[in-house]
Regions:
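Short beta-strand edge/turn micro-motifs at domain boundaries
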Residues: 123-152
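A mature extracytoplasmic/lumenal domain signature
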Residues: 62, 72-73, 97-99, 104, ...
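Short solvent-exposed beta->alpha transition segments
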Residues: 56-94
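Bacterial N-terminal signal peptides
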Residues: 5-15
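Short, low-complexity N-terminal intrinsically disordered segments enriched in polar/charged residues
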Residues: 20-65, 103, 151-155
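Surface-exposed, charged secondary-structure patches
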Residues: 82-123
Length: 155
């Protein structure tokens, strides 16, 4: 009867020792295509224009038929979005984990996470749909999704 526990202990020890001796490879970031980089740059420039309250740049970047969905599930239109952007962005806003999903050669969804200190919800997952119109990227659709683990945060 003592052989089974002893054999189990030896197997576990050998497995752990083998696992520790394996060289670990650092996770290399996926290469970013020129298309993806263009959209990431476009998204960053758009956010910068909002932060710096460059209203003409923001107005030109939002499509005439823009629609959005807020964290409460309500739709908002271009005029409501532009009135919000004219307030600017908090200085300590943080955007991270930007990903681009190519739909066609002229459209893509840019997703990212955003932390907005002092806002409710503070932690959001954003999805912006961009389409080229006359050679320029235009924001066609935006959806805010609260991260559920932070939906009831209080500052």
């Amino acid at each position: 009867m003592r052989t089974i526990p002893m054999l189990s202990a030896v197997l576990i020890s050998a497995t752990l020792a083998f696992a520790q001796n394996q060289p670990s490879k650092p996770l290399a970031p996926s290469p970013v295509s020129a298309f993806e980089q263009e959209l990431v740059n476009n998204q960053n420039q758009f956010m910068q224009a909002i932060a710096e309250q460059k209203h003409a740049v923001v107005n030109e970047s939002v499509a005439a038929d823009f629609q959005g969905i807020g964290t409460n599930g309500d739709f908002y239109d271009r005029d409501e979005f532009l009135s919000f952007t004219h307030e600017g962005l908090p200085k300590d806003l943080r955007v991270y984990e930007i990903h681009v999903v190519r739909l066609t050669d002229d459209s893509a969804v840019v997703t990212y996470n955003m932390i907005v200190p002092g806002a409710r919800p503070r932690y959001r997952h954003m999805s912006d749909t961009w389409a080229k119109d006359g050679g320029k990227w235009k924001l066609k659709f935006q959806q805010y999704t609260p991260n559920l683990w932070s939906a009831n945060d209080f500052d």
